[in-house]
A protein has these predicted regions:
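Short cysteine-rich clusters marking metal-coordination/redox-active sites
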Residues: 367-372
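Conserved C-terminal helix/tail region of periplasmic/extracytoplasmic solute-binding proteins
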Residues: 320-365
Length: 475
């Protein structure tokens, strides 16, 4: 009996300790607010709400300050995905609180979460946008016989259905006189699967969002067929938050938006360092990250501008055409109140920012080769010399060629060079562009079609390679 009683006493003591531990854990859990953030490390125009934000720890710093000021404790969980679709699925399941994605997925997110008040989301900020639409592109294999949209008829094309890149494909095909439903065979694939399919020849083209087109071209695995800027429709990425979560924890959403603004400021002020952090966090080459996220590229600008919301509304017919898309009150889905508050808290004029559609971080400075200031954002270019912490500005593409020529003559290595397309303005790799000489001026183009349009209008122009242009430009 003594043995049985002793054993019972020991078990009871253990149970009491376990119960005490559970109650302490529950109490600790009640004192800790968890925020789950869904992001896409390789979709680099969301970096100010994802990869860069995480790398710099701005959100954790903002939340820690709330705790230090007498608030609750906070725990941030980051979840990385390849596309916006799984982020939306997790928000529907109430497992992600704040997420970032492209314009088409944002609409799908709002549509699919609206049936449940606990999962219902709102669009609270923009991460980055491109006024003409160059965030989506179509690429083909190098030396592909496909040289125009017309050549895609009857071919297999990889894209991610429901994404902005698929919307681009359908609009581009329609504009090229090809029925997007029957004129090509579209394979619904994740970006990395589509990239492999293109490389292996299983598909003849890939329509995708950044950074995939630039990555494949940089790796010499593809060349650009169609620049989304030809559609001249803004494309953007942004942030959605679950309303129920935001209502329960408004201080968390406020901290997130302030942290996004911190990340945006950091990217503008230290673009090459930001590109390095994003490259480390995403596995992308730094040169590719800087193509899109460097000065004169994507506009990293948070306000919910009317031009973007109008483009948003124009995306709805496409989403309805592909199937399951419940009507969404877009004006009700968009909520700029938290962002307005964040701007006011920083002493910034939100209305002025909304009204400004210019890139907030253009290429600037003095061209050291031409010895003149860089004043025309539409022509401004950059040379990134190996070992430099900042890129060297060039007043225009011709000046950039001179800078490259001079650097080579001095034994310096050019890590990357960036120029704006002469027709569309798209920031692109100088050594991957198609060049045309017009007198003493050299013009870069992203696609064969763009170069041909110029040559047709200007018969005196001469097409040449990048190396030819560097070799013959006057120093």
């Amino acid at each position: 009996m003594k043995y049985r009683r002793a054993r019972f006493t020991a078990v009871a003591a253990v149970l009491a300790l376990v119960a005490a531990g559970c109650s302490l854990e529950q109490a600790a859990s009640r004192d800790t607010v968890k925020v789950v953030v869904g992001y896409q490390s390789k979709t680099i125009n969301t970096v100010t709400a994802g990869t860069l934000l995480r790398a710099k720890g701005f959100l954790e710093q903002r939340l820690s300050k709330l705790t230090a000021d007498g608030g609750k404790k906070y725990q941030v969980e980051w979840q990385d995905y390849d596309t916006g679709a799984p982020i939306t699925a997790q928000m529907v399941a109430e497992k992600i609180d704040i997420g970032s994605m492209g314009d088409y997925p944002l609409l799908i997110n709002g549509s699919r979460t609206q049936a449940n008040e606990r999962s219902r989301t709102e669009f609270v900020s923009v991460t980055g946008y491109q006024p003409r639409g160059s965030l989506n592109m179509i690429v083909v294999n190098r030396d592909s016989p496909v040289q125009s949209l017309h050549d895609l008829a009857g071919k297999k094309v990889s894209s991610s259905v429901g994404s902005a890149s698929d919307g681009l494909l359908r609009q581009a095909l329609s504009r090229g006189g090809i029925d997007p439903k029957s004129g090509v065979e579209v394979l619904n694939q994740q970006p990395q699967i589509g990239a492999s399919a293109l490389e292996s020849g299983q598909v003849q083209a890939l329509s995708q969002f950044v950074a995939w087109p630039g990555l494949l071209v940089f790796q010499d695995k593809a060349e650009l067929l169609f620049d989304g800027a030809e559609l001249n429709v803004p494309t953007f990425h942004g942030v959605v938050a679950r309303r129920d979560y935001s209502n329960q924890h408004p201080e968390v959403l406020d901290a997130f938006i302030q942290a996004q603004l911190d990340a945006t400021d950091f990217l503008h002020q230290r673009p090459l360092e930001a590109a390095k952090l994003v490259a480390d966090g995403s596995g992308l080459p730094q040169e590719v990250v800087y193509l899109y996220n460097g000065p004169g590229g994507t506009s990293f600008d948070t306000p919910l501008k009317p031009q973007l919301i109008q483009a948003f509304k124009g995306d709805v017919p496409y989403l309805k055409s592909i199937g399951d898309f419940a009507d969404l009150d877009i004006d009700g889905f968009v909520n700029d109140a938290p962002l307005r508050k964040a701007f006011a808290d920083r002493g910034l004029d939100y209305n002025a920012a909304v009204g400004n559609f210019a890139n907030p971080a253009p290429i600037s400075g003095t061209d050291p080769v031409a010895n003149r200031p860089v004043t025309d954002a539409a022509l401004a270019s950059e040379v990134w010399l190996d070992g430099q912490d900042t890129a060297q500005p060039a007043a225009d593409p011709t000046a950039l060629l001179r800078a490259v020529k001079q650097a080579r003559a001095q034994g310096k290595k050019v890590r990357a060079a960036y120029v704006p397309d002469a027709e569309l303005g798209t920031r692109w790799f100088a050594d991957k562009a198609l060049w045309v000489r017009a007198g003493d001026t050299y013009l870069p183009f992203t696609t064969p079609a763009a170069a041909q349009r110029y040559l047709t209008a200007h018969p005196g122009g001469t097409q040449l390679s990048y190396e030819q242009a560097v070799g013959e430009v006057r120093s």
